[in-house]
């Protein structure tokens, strides 16, 4: 009996420790020593067959042999030297979804605010996904590869000022012109759409030379490795690069692997996308399918990384022009929309190693939310559904615990009878359980069946942007963040204490003391967990207490009646 009680709590405590360890690793990652040079070529895997396409994608040798004015190339990937970004004229674009800032120095998107996503520092301000300041660098860059063609270091010209998507307009375009070089005129075009986080980035190339040209275009994200601001009290799911192809499916490219120079990912393909991910949000380049491309990811300097894609513009004859367009998705990881934007894009929502449980849990949560309009109520309904699904197992466990509670005095006498002879005492207890038809481990079932759901819901809360700033009631304004006043963890501890009172008392003094401090220890753990997870655990405990109390009352009542009948006879 003592063993099964101890194992029951040990299993749950171990689960909490695993989550705590994950939090520690994310919040305090091992630091990398300074490196004096950019890493060499990464290990590549499954390079694909895109080289058989009519228009070739530049490999390492081709791209590095192309002289570029105002830029450099390393192993075929356009890069920039680490350091401060140059600054030019600012152009701001506002739609119903985003507020963007484009700098004519490079024609980069230097800042992008998501108007429907509040900032963690101040929920009255929009969240800035892309930004460039002394503390953080995360920008979208693009350019062309070829003699005299503009790169992300070229100064473009455009009419500075503020642009806004007017009522009745479906899209707005911003055109930036590069200096004409040797008869080649290039225009970079940004197209913003109403009701969408997709931004089309295009290059129009007009060739007035006497010979044909065959340029390539590149599109990349540049960012540092710092985790998103405001994630101190919760675990970021992942911060780093990611890539998807139909052949290799979804693959993360961790910054640590880029530091070591051993990142492995498919390089050439004619499908897929590449992105930078962080908790709740992503920025992904989405070239159209059947277009040959080359993916790359690199460490540029201390705490600075890039991930991008090279695609061909095609051969442009004299007097002709060509256009290449690659959409950029920069926005929240909204699961209901990502799959329709690009194949595999919904895989960026990562529920950890229990995705097989986490995905159905989120689907069920979303269903309940569509009925109630409140994510907190949806969590309560989810808890009740899970409890109902596991009712037979829980009932069996609580019946076992109730029977153990009845025979606790006999077990105590067995312990006293055998004294310090633990081997004989253990054998006597096993014989006793067999005689009484009691499974000493049966009481573990209520906890065991909840552990996978508990861990899965933990990752659902930390990975689903739909639950970011989702309020419940009263002081709970963000179910994905810890309870700011620790009310739910304290109530959770009280409920655990009450549940403990219904359980068989421990006969071993040391285990008894351990069991007494368990509610307090778990309450401290729950201080750091999302309020939604604590709400789930609290409701589950309340339902468990009600179920356990009812079963215990029935069994004890039945035992009392049996005892009376024996005495009467």
Swiss-Prot record:
Coiled coil (UniProt feature): none
Molecular function per GO: membrane insertase activity
Any one of the GO CC terms: plasma membrane
Protein's UniProt keywords contain Transmembrane helix: yes
GO BP, one annotated term: protein insertion into membrane
Chain positions covered by the region annotation Disordered: 32-81
Transmembrane helix keyword on record: yes
UniProt biased composition (Polar residues): 32-52, 62-74
Keywords: Cell inner membrane, Cell membrane, Chaperone, Membrane, Protein transport, Transmembrane, Transmembrane helix, Transport
Main function: Required for the insertion and/or proper folding and/or complex formation of integral membrane proteins into the membrane. Involved in integration of membrane proteins that insert both dependently and independently of the Sec translocase complex, as well as at least some lipoproteins. Aids folding of multispanning membrane proteins.
Subunit composition and interactions: Interacts with the Sec translocase complex via SecD. Specifically interacts with transmembrane segments of nascent integral membrane proteins during membrane integration.
Name this protein carries in UniProt: Membrane protein insertase YidC
């Amino acid at each position: 009996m003592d063993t099964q009680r101890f194992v029951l709590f040990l299993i749950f405590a171990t689960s909490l420790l695993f989550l705590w360890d994950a939090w520690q690793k994310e919040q305090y990652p091992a630091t990398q020593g300074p490196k004096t040079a950019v890493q060499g070529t990464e290990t590549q895997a499954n390079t694909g067959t895109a080289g058989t396409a009519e228009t070739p994608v530049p490999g390492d040798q081709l791209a590095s042999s192309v002289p570029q004015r105002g830029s450099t190339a390393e192993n075929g990937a356009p890069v920039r030297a680490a350091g401060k970004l140059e600054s030019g004229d600012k152009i701001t674009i506002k739609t119903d979804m985003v507020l963007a800032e484009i700098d004519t120095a490079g024609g980069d998107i230097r800042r992008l605010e998501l108007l429907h996503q509040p900032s963690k520092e101040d929920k009255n301000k929009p969240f800035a996904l892309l930004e460039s300041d002394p503390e953080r660098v995360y920008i979208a860059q693009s350019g062309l590869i070829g003699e005299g063609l503009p790169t992300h270091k070229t100064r473009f010209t455009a009419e500075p000022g503020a642009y806004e998507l007017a009522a009745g307009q479906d899209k707005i375009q911003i055109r930036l012109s590069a200096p004409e070089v040797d008869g080649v005129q290039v225009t970079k075009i940004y197209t913003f759409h109403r009701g969408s986080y997709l931004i089309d980035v295009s290059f129009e190339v007009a060739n007035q030379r006497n010979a044909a040209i065959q340029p390539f275009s590149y599109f990349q994200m540049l960012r540092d490795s710092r985790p998103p601001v405001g994630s101190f009290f919760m675990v970021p799911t992942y911060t780093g690069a990611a890539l998807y192809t139909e052949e290799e499916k979804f693959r993360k490219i961790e910054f640590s692997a880029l530091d070591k120079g051993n990142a492995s990912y498919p390089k050439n393909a004619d499908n897929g996308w590449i992105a930078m991910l962080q908790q709740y949000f992503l920025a992904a380049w989405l070239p159209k399918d059947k277009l040959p491309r080359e993916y790359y990811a690199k460490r540029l300097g201390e705490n600075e990384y890039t991930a991008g894609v090279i695609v061909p513009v095609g051969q442009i004859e004299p007097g002709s022009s060509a256009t290449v367009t690659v959409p950029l998705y920069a926005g929240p990881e909204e699961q209901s929309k990502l799959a329709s934007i690009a194949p595999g894009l919904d895989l960026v929502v990562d529920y950890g190693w229990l995705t097989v449980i986490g995905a159905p849990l989120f689907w069920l949560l979303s269903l309940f939310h569509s009925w109630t309009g409140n994510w907190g109520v949806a969590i309560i309904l989810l808890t009740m559904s899970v409890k109902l699904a596991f009712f037979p197992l829980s009932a069996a466990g609580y019946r076992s615990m109730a029977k153990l509670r009845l025979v606790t005095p006999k077990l105590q006498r067995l312990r006293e009878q055998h004294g310090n002879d633990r081997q004989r005492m253990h054998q006597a207890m096993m014989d006793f359980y067999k005689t009484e038809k009691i499974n000493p481990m049966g009481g573990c079932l209520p906890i065991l069946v909840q552990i996978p759901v508990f861990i899965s819901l933990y990752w659902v809360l930390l990975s689903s942007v739909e639950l970011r700033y989702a309020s419940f009631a009263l002081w709970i304004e963000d179910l994905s963040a810890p309870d700011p006043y620790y009310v739910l963890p304290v109530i959770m501890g009280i409920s655990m204490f009450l549940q403990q009172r219904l359980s068989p008392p421990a006969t071993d003094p040391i285990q008894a003391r351990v069991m007494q401090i368990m509610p307090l220890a778990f309450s401290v753990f729950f201080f750091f967990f999302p309020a939604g997870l604590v709400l789930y655990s609290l409701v589950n405990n309340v339902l468990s207490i009600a179920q356990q109390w009812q079963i215990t009352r029935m069994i004890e009542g039945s035992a009392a009646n049996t005892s009376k009948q024996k005495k009467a006879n």
